[in-house]
Amino acid sequence: METEEKNEECIYIPDTQEQIDERLALAWEGIEGMSDQQDTSEKYKDYFMKQAQFCLMIREHAGAVANGSIRQMSLNELRLMNNELYSDITPDHYDTSYTNPVYTSNLFGKELGQLLSFLAAETRAMISSAYQGDKIGIVIRLELLLEIYGIFRDAAQDDIEIKAKYVKSAMYWYVSDYAEYGALHSTVSQVNTDDEFVYKLIMESDLSDIRYLFYTGEYISKGIEHTAAHIAELPTDKVDLMADTFTEGFKNGFKMMNKDITKVKSVNIRGQFGFERFYVRAVKNFEKMGFKVAMSTNANSIFAGYELERSCIYGANPNKQYDFDHREDLALFLDGRLVTRKLEGIRASFEEHREQAAVYGGPAVLLIFGEKDFEPVSSGEIPAYNDEQKKLSASYTSKATAAVYDYVVSSHRCFTIISFPSPEIGVQYKEIFDEIVKINSLESAKYAVIQQSIIDALDQGIYAEVKGKDGNKTDLKIMLHELKDPAHQSNFENCVADVNIPVGEVFTSPVLEGTNGVLNVKKVFINGLEYRDLLINVKEGMAVDYDCSNFSDHAVDRKLIDDNIMFHHGILPMGEFAIGTNTIAYVAARKFDIESKLDILIAEKTGPHFAFGDTCYSRDEDNKTWNPDGKELIARSNSISDLRKSEPDKAYFGCHTDITIPYDELGSIEAVRADGSRITIIKDGRFVLPGTEELNKAFDAS
């Protein structure tokens, strides 16, 4: 990739507040000049005028936050302010937004259009900075905008054509120069308990006055207001049950994984705004355990990425197509040098927080499901990685994860995840919410006994066989590890309500060699995206080919999978095979017609599922764990992750994506012994193994 060489050393963020204020004052002066008189060619005047106007609006918001006047505003005034921040990218206006790469490409040509769309999107990251008092986040983006404006102004004055390479070069060095800043405000924020913006907002606000939501700078939809109102009216004992299940799951995860919780000093809470009563109880629970709580909100940007599910406390998504369009903006700049620089940024920022990272216990995550279905619209104008960049991106993800684990100690890191519905799930929202609370609170001990019956059967097999029915083409042979001491060893983990709430699965890391066949699901939602007739071919444990039927063009279908399941790795190992046992959740989903909207945490418990990528024990394979019956879990690795000591760069992929087959598409699951005899666990979507009869009661009652 061609970029202009830069002779000076990287611009490091100034140490003094005075320097930052000086840069900011100069930048605002430049933005005012850009707004007052346009010196670019006519073609670009409206673009830069709109960017300047947005920046000046950001200054007004930052001022209202700084002087406290925002807290004197009425609820309707705050709604209007919030709307003006995000209206440009909502579906009603996105078609003619300068953040839309299709629109800008049509106006300015593809190369410049993509770059200017990136710039408009990056400028929007100042919203979060304005509300958090992050002057650096504002000044670096103002300076970038002014630098690009200067290129266009000079070209107009000299009556010469704009050269995209100069625009790209300025943007490239912006991404490179501020790699540390980007890491600090994305990856490292999970361990940084010194950032108290979100913590204080949640713990100190009057939650009966929902104006507090608008002090975040996040997009506050009617759905988030509805959520906050619903949580506010719940009985205290129900909120306590929700939060206690969450925090106890985190604590029990350490016991289940045989990890030393006494070395942990902090936990990172993530989720959507609107659940503040829940968060308050969870924070208090964690603090009673002796943990500090890190909570942050980070804007989508070239540094944090444009993920549909963000790793922080976040607001509503004003337009998922916007995030989809910008998810590979880095393709505009990515080369080997930038990969190295970004890795340097991660390490440098973690060095600043080495002590906090060393005592970090992991994330406690609240996920939302039930939002309106999103079917992305693909276009050739959207930035996309080329083949070489796909390799670089995959390599970066793996190395970045490794860099994080040089500071975060895996031997005392755990997690927990719980999910609740969004009001968008439909008119039965409250009934569905109550049902999910019940499902999340199901008795672990009862399921542990039932699941042990399944494990005892599976442990007799040398492989498992899974077949679909009624048009589902699944036909998989999954090889299992040899149990050299069956009396004291097991292949499958007995998973109840600890790290993955709710209860209901047994899982293993398959032996890759000999694992072959086809995985097929008629319709499945994965990380917010729908896949129709998803099909993955598995050879020697590796996903080697794939397709779906979302688009008329199969090349576009394959790209959807490559981008969001394969993550540009070309091939991925089957990192997990599991059998979900939560038939109550399955029946509830059918009752309310929300199967397609279930979060993967619940969906994976409603049938067998397979994950491609790393195993469930990624970077923790050498930590011995045991099931409740005292048997050691030996299936913690495979032939790929076995390379972790000899060739660590080849051992991990930095991804793990679950794909579930619903019971009604399931013909059979059988364990096959060495002599060829079979133990049937599920037949025609029903549990038939002795000891599992209880699981069918939910089916029979429906």
Each language-model region and where it sits:
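Short acidic, glycine-rich loop/turn motifs
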Residues: 466-472, 523-526, 671-675
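Extended hydrophobic packing segments that form well-structured cores
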Residues: 629-702
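Active-site bordering "gate/hinge" segments
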Residues: 2-513, 683-702
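Glycine-anchored, exposed beta-strand/edge motif detector
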Residues: 606, 612, 620-626, 636-646
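Dual-mode signal for accessory low-complexity, basic/Gly-rich regions
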Residues: 545-621
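Conserved AWS/pre-SET-to-SET junction and N-terminal core of the SET lysine methyltransferase domain
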Residues: 497-535
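Short solvent-exposed loop/turn micro-motifs enriched in small/polar/acidic residues
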Residues: 459, 527-530, 570, 603
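Active-site and channel-lining beta-strand-loop segments
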Residues: 531-548
